[in-house]
Amino acid sequence: MIAIIDYGMGNIRSVEQALKYIGAAYIVTSDKEEIFRSDGVILPGVGAFPKAMDILEEKDLVRVLQEIGRSRKPLLGICLGMQLLFEKSEELQDCNGLSLLPGVIRKLKVPYKIPHMGWNELKKEGEIALWNGVEDGSFVYYVHSYYADCPNEIVYGISDYGVKVPGFVAKGNIYGAQFHPEKSGDIGMQILKNFKGVVETWKSSQLSI
């Protein structure tokens, strides 16, 4: 069972539809016990970083997500949800994030339209389980005005928008997509299927303990 975190700022409906399409069992929840009982977690998000962190704090979900991230349970952040995984953001004001990944969220300063909205090429950097069946140079769908300034060793996908935008990051059990896999057609569905596979592998490992 995959828990989709419901904190009032997520693109939950489209994530739900995507998981339903790939045959993944899921629950939409903000209940701490349900999140801990899940086999994997998706943190979606649309909106402002500081407001999102305030809501997560109010719901006591900061601690929960940090515990999930520091365990071996698979965690996938999408768009703002990915940004929240980092140490802090410069959006509106300096604001601390979940600090599960090293790096800072900075505003895009490019000679192009902001937000970066629409399809862009994703160049793979290295191989991870979520790249199974995903071709290098596939196009994915973005909507964002901020990007992750983070170490190269956690970047597994890059798109060019005047700067090198980390489109996909990963470290251990933690994954983050700056783009929207749930809106990225067949490629996005394949990435979510791969995440489902990682979740199932983790679940099997727990049953054997």
UniProtKB/Swiss-Prot annotation:
Protein function: IGPS catalyzes the conversion of PRFAR and glutamine to IGP, AICAR and glutamate. The HisH subunit catalyzes the hydrolysis of glutamine to glutamate and ammonia as part of the synthesis of IGP and AICAR. The resulting ammonia molecule is channeled to the active site of HisF.
GO molecular function, one term: glutaminase activity
Domain of life the protein comes from: Bacteria
EC number: 4.3.2.10, 3.5.1.2
Major localisation: cytoplasm
Source species of the chain: Bacillus thuringiensis (strain Al Hakam)
Subcellular location, record wording: Cytoplasm
Transmembrane segments: none
Pfam families: GATase
Catalytic activity: 5-[(5-phospho-1-deoxy-D-ribulos-1-ylimino)methylamino]-1-(5-phospho-beta-D-ribosyl)imidazole-4-carboxamide + L-glutamine = D-erythro-1-(imidazol-4-yl)glycerol 3-phosphate + 5-amino-1-(5-phospho-beta-D-ribosyl)imidazole-4-carboxamide + L-glutamate + H(+); L-glutamine + H2O = L-glutamate + NH4(+)
Keyword Mitochondrion: no
Name of the protein described by the UniProt record: Imidazole glycerol phosphate synthase subunit HisH
Subunit structure, as described in the record: Heterodimer of HisH and HisF.
Active-site residues from the entry: 79, 180, 182
One cellular component term from this protein's GO annotations in UniProt: cytoplasm
Pathways involved: Amino-acid biosynthesis; L-histidine biosynthesis; L-histidine from 5-phospho-alpha-D-ribose 1-diphosphate: step 5/9
Presence of keyword Amino-acid biosynthesis: yes
Glutamine amidotransferase type-1 domain boundaries: 1-205
A biological-process GO annotation: L-histidine biosynthetic process
Origin organism lineage: Bacteria, Bacillati, Bacillota, Bacilli, Bacillales
The entry's keywords: Amino-acid biosynthesis, Cytoplasm, Glutamine amidotransferase, Histidine biosynthesis, Hydrolase, Lyase
